[in-house]
Amino acid sequence: MRTVPLFAACLLLTLMAQAEPLPRAADHSDTKMKGDREDHVAVISFWEEESTSLEDAGAGAGRRCICTTRTCRFPYRRLGTCIFQNRVYTFCC
């Protein structure tokens, strides 16, 4: 009988870990929301020997590419966009 509550607790923790945070209340000012917004960056590395569609687009093999909310910084240049969790990011290589 102790396994059922233990299983339920594990299931609840798993669901809570996968859940997305609730959106902020609409009464926050835009300036405060801009200050609290964090920059999301996803780092992607390509180490393939064969030609890929990304390589044809300019992302060569072994080149480090990132998806960021900001503009591309030197030495990166913009090659397109990334979509992750329904958000659009800048694809820089």
Curated annotation (Swiss-Prot):
- The main location class comes to secreted
Q: Which residues form the signal peptide?
A: 1-19
Looking at the Swiss-Prot or TrEMBL record, what is one Pfam family this protein matches? Defensin_1
Q: Which SMART domains match?
A: Defensin_propep (SM01418), DEFSN (SM00048)
Q: Which domain of life is it from?
A: Eukaryota
The SS bond pairs are: 65-93, 67-82, 72-92
Q: Does the keyword Disulfide bond apply?
A: yes
Record's PROSITE patterns?
DEFENSIN
A single GO CC term, please?
A: extracellular matrix
Propeptide residues according to the Swiss-Prot or TrEMBL record: 20-62
Claim: Secreted is one of the keywords in the record:
yes
**Keywords for this protein:** Antibiotic, Antimicrobial, Antiviral defense, Defensin, Disulfide bond, Fungicide, Secreted, Signal
Its Gene Ontology biological processes?
A: antibacterial humoral response; antimicrobial humoral immune response mediated by antimicrobial peptide; cellular response to lipopolysaccharide; defense response to fungus; defense response to Gram-negative bacterium; defense response to Gram-positive bacterium; defense response to virus; disruption of plasma membrane integrity in another organism
Looking up InterPro entries in the UniProt record yields: Alpha-defensin (IPR016327), Alpha-defensin_C (IPR006081), Alpha-defensin_N (IPR002366), Beta/alpha-defensin_C (IPR006080)
Tell where it localizes.
Secreted
TM helices/strands, residue ranges:
none
Q: What does this protein do?
A: Has antibiotic, anti-fungi and antiviral activity.
Protein family membership:
Belongs to the alpha-defensin family.
Task: Indicate what this protein is called per its UniProt record.
Answer: Neutrophil cationic peptide 1 type A
Q: Which organism is it from?
A: Cavia porcellus (Guinea pig)
Q: What is the lineage of its organism?
A: Eukaryota, Metazoa, Chordata, Craniata, Vertebrata
